[in-house]
């Protein structure tokens, strides 16, 4: 608006419309994710979902943390596998930024503890958008993530 004052009203109106779309998406997400029973635990490949978990009251655990180069120790992975098996978490998630082998290794560790955890078919979008239509916008990726988590964990 400062760079193009003659169109300021249009920019501000568009911003308000977009904010309303965000509020509506969050409200819908609140309703969908509220259906997840305890344990309300989200396991992903990257801790980028901590903000998501905090807002939607989900405990978030990741196989990678801080960055895609920072890996968990073998003990931390074993502890996470124990948590998943003991809480009978049904599904863990790959995301578009993390090492898929870490999630697959975690799944194997959980299986060794006697629990059949699934890896979701729906990849989550962390820290970036997808290239495909539907996940190539903030709202599209957000809605996709909400739907994937709700479908996998709200059973």
Regions found by a protein language model. Give the residues of each.
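Extracytoplasmic metal-acquisition and chelation regions
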Residues: 1-155
